[in-house]
Curated annotation (Swiss-Prot):
Name this protein carries in UniProt: Zinc finger protein 574
Function: May be involved in transcriptional regulation.
Alphabetized SUPFAM superfamilies for the sequence: beta-beta-alpha zinc fingers
Phylogenetic classification of the source organism: Eukaryota, Metazoa, Chordata, Craniata, Vertebrata
Compartment(s): Nucleus
Organism: Mus musculus
Gene that this polypeptide is encoded by: Znf574
Zinc finger (C2H2-type) stretch: 16-38, 76-98, 126-148, 213-235, 312-334, 339-361, 367-389, 395-416, 469-492, 498-520, 526-548, 554-576, 582-604, 610-633, 639-662, 670-692, 742-764, 770-792, 798-820, 826-848
Keyword terms: DNA-binding, Metal-binding, Methylation, Nucleus, Phosphoprotein, Repeat, Transcription, Transcription regulation, Zinc, Zinc-finger
Amino acid sequence: MTEESEETVLYIEHRYVCSECNQLYGSLEEVLVHQNSHVPQQHFELVGVADPGVTVATEAASGTGLYQTLIQESQYQCLECGQLLLSPSQLLEHQELHLKMMAPQEAVPAKPPPKVPPLGSSAIHYECVDCKALFASQEMWLSHRQTHLRATPNKAPAPVVLGSPVVLGPPVGQARVAVEHSYRKAEEGGEGAAVPSVAATTEMVTEVELLLYKCSECSQLFQMPADFLEHQATHFPAPVPEAAEPATQQETQVPSPTEAAVSQPEPLPASDHSYELRNELRNGEAIGRDRRGRKPRRNNSGESGGAATQELFCSACDQLFLSPHQLQQHLRSHREGVFKCPLCSRVFPSPSSLDQHLGDHSSESHFLCVDCGLAFGTEALLLAHRRAHTPNPLHSCPCGKTFVNLTKFLYHRRTHGAGGVPLPTTPVPPEEPAISFPEPAPAETGELEAPELPVCEESSAEPAAPGSYRCLLCSREFGKALQLTRHQRFVHRLERRHKCSICGKMFKKKSHVRNHLRTHTGERPFPCPDCSKPFNSPANLARHRLTHTGERPYRCGDCGKAFTQSSTLRQHRLVHAQHFPYRCQECGVRFHRPYRLLMHRYHHTGEYPYKCRECPRSFLLRRLLEVHQLVIHAGRQPYRCSSCGAAFPSSLRLREHRCAAAAAQAPRRFECGTCGKKVGSAARLQAHEAAHAAAGPGEVLAKEPPAPRASRATRTPVAPSPTALSGTTSAAPAAPARRRGPECSECKKLFSTETSLQVHRRIHTGERPYPCPDCGKAFRQSTHLKDHRRLHTGERPFACEVCGKAFAISMRLAEHRRIHTGERPYSCPDCGKSYRSFSNLWKHRKTHQQQHQAAVRQQLAEAEAAVGLAVMETAVEALPLVEAIEIYPLAEADGVQISG
């Protein structure tokens, strides 16, 4: 079965249906067998003049050029001359010409061939050898054959052999058809005419047999998958050897040279859908193989059974079967009875199989896998699934694939034949992968094409240490090359081969398609036992149940951050490893996730892939386009948050909405076992317990890790504690505050996470990495850009439930709701005036600051004036007293007089 045919399988109501003819099947194996009829085969027609007596093999070997052109038309070839015909009717007429040439001249002329309706090259009709009636299906032919067997059960047609099989050469060897030339005996022939003469044979019947299943070990062909799988099991050693049976007469009998020549199967080239040209020998001298590739059984006399012995029928109900295995199963139903399903009327041979089938109707899954959380209806299915978690699966292929089921493993091995997928060679480290980007998706479709990002080849393995293999993309190490190959195929490969027939979405695994189909049908068969919420897959249910338990089983060993999914943890580890394999060719920026590189790519082109058909706007993500179409053009917002009143276009957006009001009303059910403190989530409890562990047994926690900051609209003023009002302190001495988290090198501010620090650093650096594509204004955070873009789009998703007024930001809605409630939670500590919003309080506080600054400036001016006057007074008082000295002219007669 090719990969194209596997993509056409749908899964509806726990059954398989063929997309070509809408026929339902109960198992995957049945629909795979049925899909072979829809696969276009390679048919050939030889154009040119056929030279009688020259076969196709000799013509192809000699290269004379009589058959030069091969076109895909025919699949029926004459074994006498090698000529290819278009239909069984043409082959029938052609074979009658050979009979006329071989018959003597005085023989009675052959009857004209019956009028056979034209058969297409792809249709297979079954013809009765007694009355030459045509049937379109094998079941109708079998039921018709029973009427002849009941009338003459011992009468068997004796075939006449025209010639030996012709082995095709390479040009036409790719289309091999198993054709049986069987002839009826003349009506007047008695029992003595075991083999009629050629002259007496006047009519001929052509039966076309397709052997679709070929053993890769011994090149033996089979028609039914049950016989093929039964034969494949013979190539594998049994776990407990059975006792050797005594030699029968068949084993001791020495075959004749004719038997040995015919019974030896000639090796044929392997192919995915190979056929075989052969001529069944049904006379007593030569023994061929039955239509299932097995030798016919012998009787005690050593003679080969004819057609009557090969056609097995039940002696109780005269039902005809094609293999002894089917007959044996049918006879057991007569001995032990059957058990019928009351819902679908299906019959089962044992009560256990009926109970297992009834579990499929009820969709009950009582057996849960402890490793991945998947649920199964039976314990056998769970045990088979648990083998997939073991390091050594039961069946492994050299190409790297591993299988728990032998049937799927045998089907997979057929793909490695000639013309199939070759086996991988010795692991060779690949070169540096080159990244190519596609053109932006057209505006009509609105589809987003993923770029051809680098993928790990199946054979790429880099030995990091003796006996270990390292992945080149994520640096994970594996002990075996098969484990590395499996990891690269399912983790890093972007190939999605399985397609949803309804919406066209591609998936990596067929099980993902089955889970995805439930989104179209609305089926949610997996309810949560805690809250009764239904889910469409067991994995989603197991992931949801972690929200009830608060468990995060996947924890990072570097930073201690916990996750609910292992894939999220693996992506998180790439950040610590500084491994960014996806690089932008234009700006050189590297990313550790491919979709981030894809979104970054559109920033360079300036054109977003998802365009609205009603307006010229485009979006980076599909969900943004869907929200835009629902809210703006359709005006639909049916989902509303009961806590904050925010309206959303879908239930998914409502579930993703994290309402701070609901979080504040939620009870705190997680209690610390050390100090008795209760928190609202398991993550906060783990952070609180980690703080106890870091503080030590004898220390007291001075400060809890900072909780996520709420929006300004949802902040409420914190009332001072009674201890602070009374001015008393606790008896226990307060321990010094412990530094937790990274610190800003500019302002020495502490943060709880590295992400918060990176956002804070943009204040110092002035970086604004989120520009608006409409007006060019840049922002430091993506949430700010998201709120800003609603100004351009006109979206107002937050509506008031009282008056119907809508807002673009949830903070504005919270402020507006206080108009109806009359709440004013923000009060001024200076004058006691209260406000509805923090921004109004902030504006009011500025007036107090201005008044305070004016008063301070006035006080400073008065102080400066007073200081200046005081300085002047101090300077005047500090001047020393100076004695005045009067100087008069000296008289000759008078002496000097100094006034004291």
